[in-house]
Regions:
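Hydrophobic alpha-helical transmembrane segments of polytopic membrane proteins
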Residues: 203-210
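Polar-ligand-bearing catalytic/cofactor-coordination segments
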Residues: 1-21, 33, 40-42, 47-199, ...
């Protein structure tokens, strides 16, 4: 179990590292293309930091509003409240605030910029359709997302995708407006010749494919964090079959979650939107296949 957790952490780390490398590669080429040099990197960093802070501090309020989640007190759902409180103590973090979505489809998610400002959201369907150990498994999974700062990781990943798309757009527009051609001719005049042309070609190819690569990396990070939350959640309850049974039951439920959309689907323990199967489709999925998650839990 501990080896799987460590392995998932390292995979997530290297994916984010590759993400950063892509951002810096695009920024360097944009600087070369426009003669801005290091100024392009400074500009990209400023934009990334501003977008990150905005998303980071407002993410929980935005998600709660989109999901139409309502806060609950201990007197309303004492078992939910006590379960969250007990698992928070076991995880060593402050108790997250509890919210509920008035929907009969079973599902749940966690949000918040850090453990001190976190929420756990469940649907009414989750409370009525899952038994005690299954509910504990789901809450432990969401608690692990909070403890692992997964909201921060996902926020950074989304922002990096935005920065990469922005840089790619700037590069393509700059080249189409003639900046790239002038830069290429300038290099040729200085003896750059073929090297300058190759640089422009490589940069343009990178600008075209980078948004797709960035999106695939973001989704891969999301899938790895789900595996990590499963493993940590099972470690928290000391009963992996509880979470495995919950995943099986939630994925088998056919009721649609009315408030779900593409902007929030990646947050839920099971993607509430229809996903197509197949090797290619899996690359664009926010979650690992449920069968693989259950199999990993059963091996613990």
């Amino acid at each position: 179990m501990y080896e799987q957790i460590t392995r998932n952490k390292w995979k997530s780390f290297f994916l984010v590292l590759f993400f950063l490398g892509l951002v810096f590669a695009l920024t360097w080429f944009f600087g070369e293309l426009t003669n801005l040099g290091p100024q392009a990197l400074v500009l990209a960093v400023i934009i990334a930091v501003a977008m990150t802070f905005g998303s980071y501090y407002a993410s929980d309020r935005i998600v709660l509003a989109i999901s139409r989640a309502k806060p609950v007190e201990k007197k309303d759902y004492p078992y939910l409240y006590n379960t969250v409180e007990g698992l928070a103590i076991a995880a060593g973090i402050p108790k997250p605030r509890c919210y509920i979505i008035d929907d009969t489809a079973p599902n749940a998610f966690a949000s918040g910029r850090n453990p001190k400002n976190s929420v756990i959201v469940v649907t009414k369907g989750l409370l009525t359709k899952l038994n005690r150990v299954e509910l504990e498994g789901v809450i432990a999974h969401e608690m692990s997302h909070i403890k692992n700062y997964d909201v921060l990781v996902q926020t950074l990943a989304v922002v990096m995708v935005g920065v990469i798309v922005l840089l790619s757009d700037w590069i393509l527009r700059t080249f189409l407006w003639g900046g790239g051609r002038r830069r290429s001719r300038s290099r040729s005049g200085k003896g750059g010749g073929n090297a300058g042309a190759i640089l422009v070609l490589v940069g343009l190819i990178l600008a075209v494919i980078s948004p797709l690569i960035a999106q695939l990396i973001r989704l891969a990070v999301s899938r790895k964090r789900e595996f990590l939350a499963d493993a940590n959640g099972a470690l928290l309850t000391r009963y992996p079959p509880g979470l495995a049974s919950a995943l099986r039951k939630i994925s088998a439920d056919k009721e649609p979650l009315e408030v779900a959309n593409k902007a929030t689907a990646h947050l839920y323990i099971i993607n509430p939107l229809l996903e197509f199967r197949g090797r290619v489709n899996r690359l664009f999925s926010t979650h690992p296949p449920v069968e693989e998650r259950i199999a990993a839990l059963e091996k613990m």
